[in-house]
């Protein structure tokens, strides 16, 4: 991810085709370790893909087809909230019992 971020920074900075050395320099400038094999893998995967805008647009199309599962997570959230409410009531009862046990007629400053 850090190599992709460095690539994007270089492109936004005006370098239309960043090299491995350019990416390495950006990553090293922040004190991060560099894996040149990963940089070369990134550059080879981006080679021939077109402009950065085209790559982002293609990725957005792919994400649009992925189901998010929002309905199932909403149902799980509601069930969790109901269970959480019961736990809160039990906790209040336990606190009340503990408070009555602590007060045995002894005052702190007596």
From Swiss-Prot:
The protein's matches in CDD domains, at most eight in alphabetical order, are given as: Ribosomal_P2
Presence of the UniProt keyword Acetylation in the record: no
Residue numbers spanned by region Disordered: 66-110
UniProt GO BP: cytoplasmic translation; cytoplasmic translational elongation
- Give any GO molecular function from the UniProt entry: protein kinase activator activity
Query: Per the record, where are the segments of Acidic residues compositional bias?
Result: 87-104
Keyword check for Phosphoprotein, yes or no. Answer: yes
**Matching InterPro entries:** P1/P2_N_sf (IPR038716), Ribosomal_P1/P2 (IPR027534), Ribosomal_P2 (IPR044076)
Main localization (coarse): cytoplasm
PTM section of the record: The N-terminus is not modified.
Keywords of the record, alphabetical order, are:
Cytoplasm, Isopeptide bond, Phosphoprotein, Ribonucleoprotein, Ribosomal protein, Ubl conjugation
**Sequence positions bearing Phosphoserine:** 29, 100
Q: Which GO terms describe its cellular component?
A: cytosol; cytosolic large ribosomal subunit; fungal-type vacuole
Query: From start to end residue, where is composition biased (Low complexity)?
Result: 69-86
Instruction: Point out the cross-link Glycyl lysine isopeptide (Lys-Gly) (interchain with G-Cter in ubiquitin) in this chain.
Output: 49
Q: Which Gene3D superfamilies match?
A: 1.10.10.1410
Q: Where in the cell is it found?
A: Cytoplasm
Protein function: Component of the ribosome, a large ribonucleoprotein complex responsible for the synthesis of proteins in the cell. The small ribosomal subunit (SSU) binds messenger RNAs (mRNAs) and translates the encoded message by selecting cognate aminoacyl-transfer RNA (tRNA) molecules. The large subunit (LSU) contains the ribosomal catalytic site termed the peptidyl transferase center (PTC), which catalyzes the formation of peptide bonds, thereby polymerizing the amino acids delivered by tRNAs into a polypeptide chain.
Q: Which HAMAP family match?
A: Ribosomal_L12_arch (MF_01478)
The similarity comment for this entry is: Belongs to the eukaryotic ribosomal protein P1/P2 family.
Q: Outline the subunit composition.
A: Component of the large ribosomal subunit (LSU). Mature yeast ribosomes consist of a small (40S) and a large (60S) subunit. The 40S small subunit contains 1 molecule of ribosomal RNA (18S rRNA) and 33 different proteins (encoded by 57 genes). The large 60S subunit contains 3 rRNA molecules (25S, 5.8S and 5S rRNA) and 46 different proteins (encoded by 81 genes). The 5 acidic ribosomal P-proteins form the stalk structure of the 60S subunit. They are organized as a pentameric complex in which uL10/P0 interacts with 2 heterodimers, P1A-P2B and P1B-P2A.
Q: What else is on record for this protein?
A: The 4 small acidic ribosomal P-proteins from yeast can be classified into two couples of similar but not identical sequences. Each couple (P1A/P1B and P2A/P2B) is distinctly related to one of the two acidic ribosomal P-proteins P1/P2 present in multicellular organisms. Present with 602000 molecules/cell in log phase SD medium.
Spell out the protein name for this chain: Large ribosomal subunit protein P2B
